[in-house]
């Protein structure tokens, strides 16, 4: 008796699975708030140099005459590229000649300026404080802001490697429980840190634990659910991220101080840590590591919740031992990473699949973590992205079955790329249009994630499928780390980051057209199955009078 049959006995889609889904998907909403947090905690408010005439009461008292604030600002700070007060320069001495009505640009362009030696004055009308205002991450230090975001995303990459190994060794539920605790503790400490490096360190720890939460949530949902209900559970898990974006915008709207916001999104994980001790360990994992007595107890617990106690009474350690013998060995074919890179039928599939994964992570996190560049009301924009993501994820499943994998993958990358490129041409004054294009683009990237997850699983044989998918996820996280850093190109032109964010998904989407279609094809189990599919494709195309170059891919 294999494990799926054991699960059917105790109930693979019953009351327990419903309760487990609620318990596991609820933290996913708050995981999303951690991922998107720095849209708000690292927001850059309007700012200018501190100047004595405006910000020092003694200097103000010595001003001859009665001048308004705008006049004092004009004689203290030169205009910036957008004709607003310059954010990083001030006049060394007040330029009183600028008050004259016949003043031209020459009157101030030759005046001596200097950096903001005495600090900055920030606009607190939207945020009481952010990490930018706390540690002055502007002007010469502006690169530190996207660096903090990249450090967080690097933590997810490291955490995925560490937690993946730990969950295979120590169990899914145990690693999940301690991941909840690490998020809550590290997130709370990050909110109290007095220096920027320490803040980044604890945000890195939060991210590594976030990876553990995401990975082990998916594992427990799948390993305690029947094959028929598995896609539903994965859909609920994906929708948790969508609702989480709405939650992020709502919480940030109500909490405008970055320290309090960091605390607000970290505190719920203490509750998740407490109730996670109730969750059962994966019986499938317990069987594979030979812990049959504990596996039997967990199966009986699930059966009791699903009201199948009579069926559970028929389970014994001997039955579980036979199930352990029937579990497939993941190393049966000796397939390795080199197989993906050196096998002609798999090499190009691997590279293009990784390119699609990279394009998603690079573009999504590059844009989703800088909503200020896409619209004026970032609270509403964050919520709208989550709302649009809901039907997009559901609709992408329908389109995959109708249009096929290859076309859906290509269009779900090309469309957001075109939306991003179009935003270059839209003036900042047209905020509604810019926000609409941004929401459409980021929503389409949600479809791209759904497509690449399914498509990459079908492109590779069973013996090396998880290696290929894991390689793709590494590419996505690598892209996510690089994405925020592209914003540093903005010093050479505000349009340049958007150009890069737009070109990468367009080129990746076009490359996806070189992949073979996998719609309605049986999943390949061996490398020989891939080669047979290629031969059939070539034969079919020759019979039809055309030979596609992608047939060997």
Swiss-Prot record:
Subcellular location, record wording: Apical cell membrane
Tissue specificity note: Expressed in the proximal tubular epithelial cells in kidney.
Catalytic activity: urate(out) + (S)-lactate(in) = urate(in) + (S)-lactate(out); nicotinate(in) + urate(out) = nicotinate(out) + urate(in); urate(out) + n chloride(in) = urate(in) + n chloride(out); orotate(out) + nicotinate(in) = orotate(in) + nicotinate(out)
GO molecular function, one term: urate transmembrane transporter activity
Keywords for this protein: Cell membrane, Glycoprotein, Ion transport, Membrane, Phosphoprotein, Transmembrane, Transmembrane helix, Transport
GO CC, any one term: brush border membrane
SUPFAM superfamilies according to UniProt: MFS general substrate transporter
Membrane topology: Multi-pass membrane protein
One example of a Gene Ontology biological process annotation: urate transport
Pfam families reported in the protein's UniProt record: Sugar_tr
Post-translational modifications: N-glycosylated.
UniProt KW Ion transport keyword: yes
Residues modified by glycosylation: 56, 102, 107
Transmembrane segments: 16-36, 146-166, 182-202, 204-224, 232-252, 260-280, 351-371, 378-398, 407-427, 435-455, 466-486, 495-515
Modified residues (Phosphoserine): 534
Superkingdom, natural source: Eukaryota
Assembly and binders: Interacts with PDZK1.
PANTHER family xref list: SOLUTE CARRIER FAMILY 22 MEMBER (PTHR24064)
Function: Electroneutral antiporter that translocates urate across the apical membrane of proximal tubular cells in exchange for monovalent organic or inorganic anions. Involved in renal reabsorption of urate and helps maintaining blood levels of uric acid. Mediates urate uptake by an exchange with organic anions such as (S)-lactate and nicotinate, and inorganic anion Cl(-). Other inorganic anions such as Br(-), I(-) and NO3(-) may also act as counteranions that exchange for urate.
Protein name from the UniProt record: Solute carrier family 22 member 12
UniProt organism field: Rattus norvegicus
